[in-house]
Curated annotation (Swiss-Prot):
Superkingdom of the source species: Eukaryota
N-terminal signal peptide: none
Role: Acyltransferase; part of the gene cluster that mediates the biosynthesis of helvolic acid, an antibacterial nortriterpenoid. Protostadienol synthase helA cyclizes (3S)-oxidosqualene to (17Z)-protosta-17(20),24-dien-3-beta-ol (protostadienol). The synthesis of protostadienol is followed by several steps of monooxygenation, dehydrogenation, and acyl transfer to yield the final helvolic acid.
Name the record gives this protein: Acyltransferase helD1
Length: 478
C-alpha cells in the first residue's frame, strides 16, 4: 500500500469537485459509437498511470489528509452507462448545449465531494449517457480537487482518450516517457526556493487569523465535511449564463485601452476580462449593510462596511517554479486582487477599464517562486487554515468573487476514436449564489474568442444583463 500525503496546495478548496461534460456527435451513425466496453477497458489501462484515482482519502491528523492506494483493493471508480431516449443530439445543438436542454441526471455528483454508497469518496466518477437514436454521447467526468487541479484533470482525460484510441487501432501508445505523469507531492518541496517573499496583507490575515468555526471544519474527516458542506451548497440558489466574447471584440478592447496604460505595460486577455467582470458585477447590485448575528462571528471588524472588491484568481505556478515533471497534483496559488469599490463602481469606459485591468496585472506580476514558497509555508504551519477563506467569502457575498481562466486547458483534444468533442462545459452543479466566472475556450480555439460561464445571485445577474458596456461586448449564448 502506498500512502500519499496531500500538500498544502491540495487542501485549497479540496472538497470541491471538478465536473465537466463532453459532448460527442455520432456524425457517421456508427452502431458501435464510443462503445462502453472499450471505454471501460481503456479506463483501467489508463489508471495504471494515474493510480491515485483509485485511492482512498484518510484524515491522519488535524488538517492533514493522505490518499491510500492499495493496488490489491482499489477504491473502484463510479462508471455507469445510461440511455436517454427523450433527447436527440439535434435538440442539444439547436439549444447551443444550454443547461436546461440537457437530459436529467447527466451529473452523478454534486458540487462537493461526498461519500458514495460504500462510504468512500470516489476519486473518479464517469457517466456515459447515450442520446436518442444513437445520435451522440454525453460523457460526464468528475474528479475531486483533493487529488488534481485543472492541469491534472485534463491530463488524465486526454491520456484516457489516447489509450482507447490506440487500443481501437491496435497500436502501441507513444513512448512511455512522454506519457509518464507524476503525483509525487515531494516534487513541490524540491522546487521551492530558499528565499521568501512577503504575502499581501489580506492573504496573510485570512490564513493567519484563527477562526473557531471554520477551523473546526478542518478537524472533520473528508466524508463528514463533504456531507455537511453538500447540505449548505444545496441551499444556494443562483442564476448562471454562458456568454461569448468574440475575438474581434477583445482585440478592439485592447486597442481602446492602449492610450490609458503606460507604454511599457502589456495587458493580457485575462487582465481585461477580470477587470470587466469585476466592474460589471459591482455595478449590478446595491451593497448591503455588514452582516450581524451569527455571520458576524465569521468576520473581524464587525459593523465595518466593506470598502474593496476582492477577486480571487487561481494561478498555476508550475511555470514559475520551473517544474519539469508532468505533475498532476494541485499547484494553484490563489492571488487576491483588491480594488476600491468606488473605483469599480465608476461607469465602464476604456479609461476606467484600463485602470482596473492594470491593477489586475500588477497583482498577477507579484507571483514569483518566493511568494509561492511563503504561501506554502503559511498553510503548512497552520494545518487548519486551508478552510479559512470560507469565512471571508461567506461574509462578502456581494464584494468578492472568483475568476478562473481555463483557456489554456486542452479541453477539445479528448478523441476516444470517433472524433473530438463538439462542446465542453462545466455542469449545472457549478451554479450557485456565490459569484464565479469561468473563462473557457471555444471549440474554434483562440480565433473563436472566449466563453464566460458566469454564475451569481439572481439580483446581480439581472443587473449584469442590463449593463450597457457589457452588452456591447458580449453575446449571450444561453
Amino acid at each position: 500500500m502506498e500512502s500519499i500525503p496531500l500538500s498544502p496546495f491540495d487542501l485549497q478548496g479540496s472538497f470541491s469537485n471538478i465536473p465537466y461534460a463532453f459532448f460527442y456527435e455520432n456524425t457517421q451513425s456508427e452502431n458501435d459509437f464510443m462503445p462502453f466496453d472499450f471505454l471501460k477497458g481503456s479506463l483501467w489501462a489508463s489508471l495504471q498511470r494515474f493510480p491515485i484515482l483509485t485511492g482512498r482519502l484518510r484524515a491522519r491528523s488535524t488538517g492533514h489528509i493522505v490518499v491510500e492506494v492499495d493496488a490489491g483493493n482499489p477504491n473502484q471508480p463510479d462508471i455507469r452507462e445510461t440511455l436517454c431516449d427523450s433527447v436527440h443530439w439535434s435538440q442539444l445543438k439547436e439549444s447551443s448545449f444550454a443547461w436546461d436542454a440537457w437530459p436529467a441526471g447527466v451529473a452523478t455528483v454534486g458540487p462537493v465531494a461526498t461519500a458514495a454508497a460504500d462510504g468512500e469518496i470516489k476519486l473518479l466518477n464517469i457517466h456515459v449517457m447515450r442520446l436518442a437514436q444513437n445520435s451522440g454521447v454525453i460523457l460526464f467526468i468528475n474528479i475531486p480537487h483533493y487529488v488534481v487541479d485543472g492541469v491534472g484533470y485534463f491530463a488524465f482525460i486526454n491520456h484516457w482518450a489516447e489509450t482507447m484510441r490506440m487500443q481501437q487501432q491496435q497500436q502501441e501508445q507513444e513512448n512511455e516517457a512522454r506519457s509518464r505523469f507524476s503525483f509525487d507531492r515531494g516534487i513541490i518541496q524540491r522546487y521551492l526556493p530558499t528565499e521568501r517573499a512577503p504575502l499581501d496583507p489580506l492573504t496573510a490575515s485570512i490564513y493567519g487569523q484563527r477562526n473557531l468555526l471554520v477551523d473546526w471544519l478542518a478537524w472533520l474527516s473528508p466524508t463528514t465535511l463533504g456531507g455537511l458542506l453538500s447540505k449548505t451548497a444545496a441551499m444556494a440558489r443562483g442564476e448562471a449564463h454562458l456568454f461569448r466574447i468574440p475575438r474581434a471584440s477583445l482585440d478592439q478592447v485592447h486597442k481602446d485601452v492602449q492610450p490609458y496604460i503606460p507604454a511599457s505595460a502589456r495587458l493580457s486577455d485575462n487582465d481585461l476580462l477580470v477587470a470587466l467582470i469585476s466592474k460589471t458585477y459591482i455595478q449590478s447590485q446595491p451593497q448591503p449593510k455588514p452582516p450581524t448575528g451569527f455571520l458576524s462571528w465569521l468576520r473581524p471588524g464587525q459593523g465595518q462596511p466593506e470598502s474593496h472588491c476582492t477577486v480571487r484568481i487561481p494561478c498555476d505556478v508550475r511555470r514559475h517554479l520551473k517544474v519539469r515533471e508532468r505533475y498532476t497534483g494541485n499547484l494553484l496559488l490563489g492571488m487576491m486582487v483588491r480594488t476600491p469599490l468606488a473605483e469599480l463602481a465608476r461607469p465602464t469606459s476604456s479609461e476606467t477599464l484600463a485602470a482596473a485591468a492594470l491593477n489586475v496585472r500588477q497583482s498577477i506580476e507579484r507571483v514569483q517562486p518566493g511568494l509561492v514558497a511563503a504561501y506554502h509555508d503559511l498553510i503548512q504551519a497552520n494545518p487548519t487554515s486551508h478552510m479559512r477563506p470560507l469565512a471571508f467569502t461567506a461574509t462578502r457575498t456581494t464584494t468578492s468573487l472568483v475568476t478562473t481562466s481555463q483557456v489554456r486547458f486542452p479541453m477539445y483534444e479528448a478523441d476516444f476514436g470517433s472524433g473530438k468533442p463538439c462542446f465542453v462545459c462545466l455542469t449545472p452543479v457549478f451554479a450557485g449564489s456565490y459569484t464565479m466566472a469561468a473563462i473557457l475556450p471555444t471549440p474554434e480555439g483562440r480565433e473563436g474568442g472566449v466563453y464566460v460561464l458566469l454564475t451569481s445571485n439572481v439580483e446581480a445577474m439581472q443587473g449584469i444583463k442590463k449593463n450597457q458596456y457589457w452588452n456591447g461586448l458580449v453575446e449571450i449564448i444561453w
